[in-house]
Amino acid sequence: MAKHLFTSESVSEGHPDKIADQISDAVLDAILEQDPKARVACETYVKTGMVLVGGEVTTSAWVDIEEITRKTVREIGYTHSDMGFDADSCAVLNAIGKQSPDINQGVDRADPAEQGAGDQGLMFGYANNETDVLMPAPITYAHALVKRQSEVRKDGTLPWLRPDAKSQVTFAYEDGKIVGIDAIVLSTQHREDVTQADLIEGVMETIIKPVLPAQWLNKDTKYFINPTGRFVIGGPVGDCGLTGRKIIVDTYGGMARHGGGAFSGKDPSKVDRSAAYAARYVAKNIVAAGLADRCEIQVSYAIGVAEPTSISIETFGTGKVSEEVLIKLVRQHFELRPYGLTAMLDLARPIYQQTAAYGHFGREGFPWEATDKAEMLRADAGL
C-alpha cells in the first residue's frame, strides 16, 4: 500500500507578515465601506517601531490610515513597548498614491458586465473531501493550532503567551487516506519569565490536545514545541513583515498549485484575489456535489479583457464525470468574468480584514464557501 507524508504550516495574526496583511485589508475595508467601487492596491511593511502603508488607490472615500493601522495593531495584541512594537507609539508612514489611468481605462467599461480584468494572471481553486469544510487536513489543523494560540492568549488562559506564533502539521497518508499525524511543530512567542517546562505543558494541554483529533495521535507522533528553547523576541522586532508573503498559508498549504498572486489589500477588480475566491467556490461545489473527491481548477485572464482566457480542471483520477463535462458545467453555472464573479459572491463590501489571518478558505461564513450550486451540478451531470 502506498504511504506518504504531507506537511502544511500556518502563522498567527501576530506574525509580522500577517500584521501587514491585516493592516492592508483593514484599509481596504474602510475604503469599501464608503465606496464599493473603489480601486485599491494597499501594501504594508512593518519593522521595529514603524509601519509603512503604501500603494495605489482610486476612490471618493477618505479614511484615516494612521488610526486604522493603530487599531489593527492594537487588536492583534501589540500594546506594550516591552514587546518592541506598540500600537500607540509606533510610527505610521503613509505613501498611498493614485492608480494609473492606463490601468483604469482597461478595467472600467460603459457596460459594467464587460469590466476587464485588473491584470493578467492565473489563479487556482481547490477542494477535497478529507475534512468537513472540504479542505486539506494539514492546512486546516495548522490554522486551528495558531487560532487556538490566539484564543488562549487573549482570554488569559495562558497569560505568558505573546502574539507571534507558527505551526506546522505533518499528516501520514495511506492510499490517499489519512492514517495519522506524524509530526507537530508549534513555536510561540512568550514572556521571558515562563519556563520551558511550563510552556511545553501549557501548549500541549491547552492548544494541541483540544485541537487535534485524538484518533490521529499515537505513540509515534513527534511533538516540537518551541524547539529552539526560547522565543521571547518576536513580531516586527524579530523579523520585518510585508503584505503578500504568506500566499501558501493563505490558500491550501501547498496541496494545490498557486498562481503567485497575493490577496490582501486588493479590491475585487484584482482577479488575483476575486478569481481565486471564485475558483475555490467552483472546486468546493464540484466536490460537495460528489462529482470528484479532489478538484483543482485553473482560470486565467488578460488585463482589460472580461472573459477568462482559459479554464482547466484536474480531478486526479477521482472524477465521476469527465473533466470536459465539468468545464461545461462550470461555464453553465458559474460567472467567471470580473464583474459577474464580484456580483455572484457579493465581493464589493468590507469583508476582507477577517480573511487576513488563519486562511481565506475553509472558514464558514464567506460567500465563496457556500455549496449552493452542488445539487444543480449533480443533477445536470446526471448523477
Swiss-Prot record:
InterPro entries per record:
ADOMET_SYNTHASE_CS, S-AdoMet_synt_C, S-AdoMet_synt_central, S-AdoMet_synt_N, S-AdoMet_synthetase, S-AdoMet_synthetase_sfam
Q: Which top EC class is given? A: transferase
CDD domains, alphabetized: S-AdoMet_synt
The biological processes this protein is annotated with in GO are: one-carbon metabolic process; S-adenosylmethionine biosynthetic process
E.C. numbers: 2.5.1.6
| Localization terms from the record | Cytoplasm
Does the keyword section mention Flavoprotein?
no
The UniProt keywords, alphabetically, are: ATP-binding, Cytoplasm, Magnesium, Metal-binding, Nucleotide-binding, One-carbon metabolism, Potassium, Transferase
Q: Pathway, per UniProt?
A: Amino-acid biosynthesis; S-adenosyl-L-methionine biosynthesis; S-adenosyl-L-methionine from L-methionine: step 1/1
Where does the chain bind K(+)?
Answer: 43
A single MF term (Gene Ontology)? magnesium ion binding
Q: Which residues bind L-methionine?
A: 56, 99, 239, 270
Gene3D superfamilies listed in its UniProt record: 3.30.300.10
Q: Is DNA-binding among the key words of this record?
A: no
Q: Where does Mg(2+) bind?
A: 17
Cite the binding residues for ATP: 15, 164-166, 230-231, 239, 245-246, 262, 266
Instruction: Write out the ranges of the annotated region (Flexible loop).
Output: 99-109
Q: Subunit comment for this entry?
A: Homotetramer; dimer of dimers.
Role noted for this protein: Catalyzes the formation of S-adenosylmethionine (AdoMet) from methionine and ATP. The overall synthetic reaction is composed of two sequential steps, AdoMet formation and the subsequent tripolyphosphate hydrolysis which occurs prior to release of AdoMet from the enzyme.
Q: Give the record's family classification.
A: Belongs to the AdoMet synthase family.
| Protein's recorded name | S-adenosylmethionine synthase
Gene of origin? metK
